[in-house]
Amino acid sequence: MLATDRTTLAQFLVEECRGRAGDDSELLGLLLDVAQACKTISKMTAMGSLAGVHGYNGDVNPQGENQARLDLMSNQAFVRATERTGHAAGLASEEMEEVLGFPESYARGTLLLVFDPLDGSSNIDINGTVGSIFSILPMPRPGEAPQTADFLQSGRQQVAAGYALYGPSTMFVLTIGSGVHGFTLDPLLGDFILTHPSMTVIPESGEFAINSSNSRFWEPPIRAYVDELLAGRSGPRSKDYNMRWIAALVADVHRILLRGGIYLYPRDTKTPDLAGRLRLLYEAAPVAFLMEQAGGRCTTGTRTMLDLVPGSLHERVPLIFGSAVEVERVETLYREPQRREFATPLFNQRGLFRD
C-alpha cells in the first residue's frame, strides 16, 4: 500500500491496478474521468449564488422530482467528462429518463457508468452538504450501442463504486473491490490526495439516521427497532443512542464510514405504490458495495442489496445500511412473525412513536 503522504488518486489507482489480473486501463481512466466531473461540481457548489447555481428551473426528473439548476449542471459535468475519453460505453443517470450512448464517431469503452450527479439537492439553497454517487459496471455487449437491458445488472457485478462529498472540504471515496479509500481535494494542486486509506465501518455504534416524521407510516419491524433505540439504557439495548438526519445520502454514508451507526430509509405506507424511496441502480447498489467492502452490511430489510437485479433504470428500494450488528438486528426483526395488529387501540402494538 502506498503511503498516505501526498499520494494522488492517479498514483493510487495505478498502484492498485498493477496487482490485478487483466487490463484495468479503462477502469483507471473512467475513475479519473469521474473524479474530474466531481472537481467541476465541487467548484460550482463552492461558488453558490455567485455562479447562479441556486434555485429550480421548473422541470422535473424521470421520478417526478423538481430539478434544481445544479442537478442539471452536475449531470452535464459527468457527460462532458466521459463522452470523448473512450473509457465508457454508455451512461445512466437519475436526471436522464433513458440511457445515453455516444456517437459512433467517438471511441467506446467496455464499461458502463451510472450515477446520481447531485445527491441531496434540497440542501443547495441552504448551503448544506451535497454529493455525487456513482457505480461502474461491465458492458455485456462490448462495441454495441448501449441499451437499457445492459445496465440491469446485480450489484455483485460492479467493478467500482464511490461518491464525492462537497462539504467544508471535497472528498472522493471509492472501492474497486479491495477496500474503501478516501481522498481529499487539494484546492491548490487540483488533485485528490489519499487521506483516508482502508476505511472500515465499526461493528457497533450509538448513532442512527432515519426520518422520524414518517414514523406513522413505518412497517412494524422498523417501529420495533427504533423503539429499542429510543428506550436507551433502560431498554433492551442497554445504552443511549443519538439520531442524525442530514437529508443527503452521501453525507450519511460518509459519517457511517467514519463513526459507524445505521441508516434507514425503509419502505412505508405513505406512498404504498412505491417499494422504497431510493434508487437501486445508482444509489443503493453503490452504497452496498462500499459498505460490504468496509465491513458493514446493506439490506432492504429482507434481502441483501447486492443480490438484487433492477427491473428498470429508476427502480426504487428500501435502503438500510451501516454497522453489521445494527443491520443484523433489523434483519432479525423482519424475519420474526408479525405480531397481530388488533383493531382496538388498547390492545394494538404500541411504540414510542404514536400514530
UniProtKB/Swiss-Prot annotation:
Residues that coordinate or bind Mg(2+) 2: D116, D119, E283
Name of a matching Pfam family: FBPase
Annotated metabolic or biological route of this protein: Carbohydrate biosynthesis; Calvin cycle
CDD domains, A to Z: FBPase (cd00354)
Residues bound to substrate: D119, G120, S121, S122, N211, Y263, L264, Y265
GO MF, one annotated term: fructose 1,6-bisphosphate 1-phosphatase activity
The reaction(s) this protein catalyses: beta-D-fructose 1,6-bisphosphate + H2O = beta-D-fructose 6-phosphate + phosphate
Alphabetical keyword list: Calvin cycle, Carbohydrate metabolism, Cytoplasm, Hydrolase, Magnesium, Metal-binding
Transmembrane region(s): none
Record GO biological process: fructose 1,6-bisphosphate metabolic process; fructose 6-phosphate metabolic process; fructose metabolic process; gluconeogenesis; reductive pentose-phosphate cycle; sucrose biosynthetic process
Record flagged with keyword Hydrolase: yes
Location within or outside the cell: Cytoplasm
The UniProt record lists the keyword Metal-binding: yes
Enzyme class: hydrolase
PROSITE patterns: FBPASE
Binding locations of Mg(2+) 1: E94, D116, L118
Xref: NCBIfam families: PRK09293.1-3, PRK09293.1-4
Family: Belongs to the FBPase class 1 family.
Name assigned to this protein: Fructose-1,6-bisphosphatase class 1
Organism: Rhodospirillum rubrum (strain ATCC 11170 / ATH 1.1.1 / DSM 467 / LMG 4362 / NCIMB 8255 / S1)
